[in-house]
């Protein structure tokens, strides 16, 4: 009694579902390419978590304005090769981003035997097996310029100490994280799609429904994360991981709910009536769950000053909105158009044949006739 009839909405879905499905097919490839574009800038570390609208972000911006960007790297090389260490230090100093170097050959002298150096000084730059070069660089903690600088330093160190030099530092860690993620991201995405397909295959007992659902679900995710390419937004990779997982799970639930209800209704109804009945029955549960998530996401975005949380809220709100539109409008279009294929590729579907009478319609007509007779 508290829920308005959804017959009008169901009829609206029936009118627009096929064009909506065509739109999904039209944007699936561009959305996939855009969401995985190398032109999207990801933040992997913590240096951009607090923006200029926070006190901490303003203080950090002021420090950078006065002193510039600064980071510290450490190069570890095998101990005892003083001449090679000197050559390495000289070549690193030639890099414009390297502000200073602290090492044995720089603090003391390559001509002074280590046995004659002061122990306190020696302990700062020499270990039992390795010598340490501490580099102060004028580079941010992460970003394209940092990634290029780390690559240059690694190439120089490997030239002097092939396979033996080691490099550490915040910018180095961020670069390693970026390189690892870049290689693994495609594999992880593929595994996620295969896993979702397998779950849907077991849940629907159909060969065609999992393909349809994965297409609609993944396209909605790709559309969500294609936006930064066109808006220039820098994307926190952690936000991408969290929101894409949530959006995937949410859309799978909605898709299974609608697909299963449609299959049940098709046993006793023709596809038009079954689709109308499905949308009347499933719209409220889907909208209730989805609206809670999208409102929560936008509230987190509006309230939080933490960069990652703020972006998680934004992508969650937008992503759930896209998933709702895709599941409520495009998915019914695929179910309607591919009804015959679904019936043939689904285990024990028992869809009502085209030439069969609709039991629901017959019952309604019989009731109306009885009422008239009385």
Each predicted region: which residue ranges?
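Membrane-embedded transmembrane helical bundles of large multi-pass transporters/channels
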Residues: 1-41, 158-374
């Amino acid at each position: 009694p508290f829920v308005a009839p959804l017959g009008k909405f169901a009829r609206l879905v029936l009118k627009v579902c096929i064009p909506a499905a065509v739109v999904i097919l039209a944007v699936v490839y561009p959305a996939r390419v855009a969401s995985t574009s190398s032109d999207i800038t990801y933040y992997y570390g913590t240096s951009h978590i607090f923006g200029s609208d926070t006190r901490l972000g303003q203080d950090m911006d002021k420090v950078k304005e006065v002193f510039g960007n600064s980071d510290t790297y450490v190069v570890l090389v095998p101990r005892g090769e003083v001449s090679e260490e000197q050559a390495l230090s000289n070549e690193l100093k030639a890099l414009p981003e390297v502000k200073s170097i602290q090492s044995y050959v720089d603090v003391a002298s390559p001509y002074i035997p280590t046995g004659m150096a002061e122990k306190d000084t020696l302990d700062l730059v020499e270990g039992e097996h390795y010598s340490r070069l501490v580099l102060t660089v004028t580079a941010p903690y992460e970003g394209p310029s940092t990634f290029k600088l780390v690559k240059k330093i690694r190439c120089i160190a490997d030239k002097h100490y092939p396979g033996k030099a080691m490099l550490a530092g915040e910018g180095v860690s961020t670069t390693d994280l970026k390189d690892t993620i870049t290689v693994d991201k495609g594999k992880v995405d593929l595994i996620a799609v295969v896993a979702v397909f397998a779950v849907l295959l077991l849940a629907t007992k159909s060969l065609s429904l999992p393909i349809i659902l994965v297409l609609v679900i993944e396209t909605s995710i790709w559309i969500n994360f294609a936006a930064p390419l066109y808006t220039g937004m820098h994307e926190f990779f952690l936000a991408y991981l969290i929101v894409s997982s949530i959006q995937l799970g949410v859309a799978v639930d909605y898709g299974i709910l609608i697909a299963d209800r449609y299959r049940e209704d098709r046993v006793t109804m023709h596809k038009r009536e079954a689709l109308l009945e499905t949308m009347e029955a499933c719209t409220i549960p889907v909208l209730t769950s989805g609206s809670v998530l999208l409102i929560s996401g936008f509230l987190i975005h509006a309230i939080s000053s933490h960069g990652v949380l703020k972006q998680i809220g934004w992508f969650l709100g937008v992503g759930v909105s896209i998933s709702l539109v895709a599941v409520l409008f495009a998915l019914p279009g695929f179910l309607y158009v591919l009804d015959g294929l679904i019936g043939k590729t689904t285990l024990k579907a028992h869809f009502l044949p085209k030439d069969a009478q609709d039991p629901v319609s017959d019952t309604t007509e019989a009731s109306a006739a009885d009422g008239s007779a009385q």
